[in-house]
Regions:
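Compact beta-rich and alpha/beta scaffold cores in large eukaryotic transport/transcription complexes
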Residues: 32-33, 51-52
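Secondary-structure boundary/capping signal
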Residues: 36-37, 81
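Charged, compositionally biased boundary regions
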Residues: 53-209
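Short, extreme N-terminal segment that most often corresponds to the first beta-strand
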Residues: 2-31, 39-40
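Structured loops at beta-to-helix junctions and adjacent beta-edge loops in soluble globular domains
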Residues: 19, 50-51
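Ser/Thr- and Asn-enriched, surface-exposed coil loops between beta-strands
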Residues: 42-44
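Short, intrinsically disordered, mixed-charge
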Residues: 33-34, 75
Length: 209
């Protein structure tokens, strides 16, 4: 695929961040039904890196797939799961925690917010983020950027939406999240998988059955 093609049609991808150590995540990961790389992602966090079969081969929307995965993991474990996802048109997240209704937010490709402010506040509360400093940073992610889409190619490449996800991760570093090098929002499943396999201590989860 040429550089121009990859810019015009970014590949869908996702990351599943779990607020638990890798051993705890590996114990419930078979619920997802397919093996995937699992690496540490900071203090008390781990990340699963899906290969993307359901949306690459089965044609299912990436957000629907990872929302279901996050909910399945969270119901089977005592810790929350944060799914980050993106495709050519949008990007967003879903936070699942126990049997509570998952909460999520969406940005359009050019970074325009397309979610509800209350969802972001619920997100912050469930993760125990600072109600002042972190809440202010998250609130800025729900504001429309007057320059959204003005940069040539920004809307086409989904750069604005990916920048919003990076902003979200910047806030979450204060909650302990540190993604390994190469696990960047906006990359396709192939590149994410290659980056995960290069992380020291990577392990593969098992598939159910």
């Amino acid at each position: 695929m040429s550089t121009e093609e990859s810019m015009s049609a970014p590949a869908p991808g996702a990351l599943l961040l779990c607020r638990a150590e890798p051993d705890s995540v590996a114990a419930v990961a078979p619920l997802l039904g397919e093996p995937m790389p699992l690496v540490r992602a900071g203090d008390g966090w781990s990340v699963l890196v899906p290969e993307g079969g359901p949306w690459r081969d089965g044609g299912e929307p990436v957000d629907r797939v990872v929302t279901g995965w996050a909910a399945a993991l969270a119901v089977g474990a005592p810790w929350p799961v944060l799914a980050l996802w993106w495709d050519a048109d949008r990007a967003g997240y879903t936070l699942a925690s126990g049997f509570r209704r998952p909460v999520g937010y969406v940005w359009l490709a050019n970074g325009t917010p397309a979610g509800e402010d209350e969802a972001m506040r619920t997100f912050a509360a469930r993760l125990g983020l600072d109600p002042v400093l972190d809440a202010q940073s998250l609130d800025r992610l729900t504001r429309t950027d007057p320059d959204a889409g003005r940069e040539p190619g920004a809307a086409r490449a989904g750069a604005g939406a990916r920048a919003r996800l990076r902003g979200l991760l910047a806030v979450l570093t204060r909650a302990g999240i540190t993604l390994p090098a190469g696990l960047d929002p906006g990359e396709g499943a192939d590149r994410l998988g290659a980056a995960a396999r290069a992380v020291p201590g990577v392990r593969w989860t098992e598939a159910a059955g």
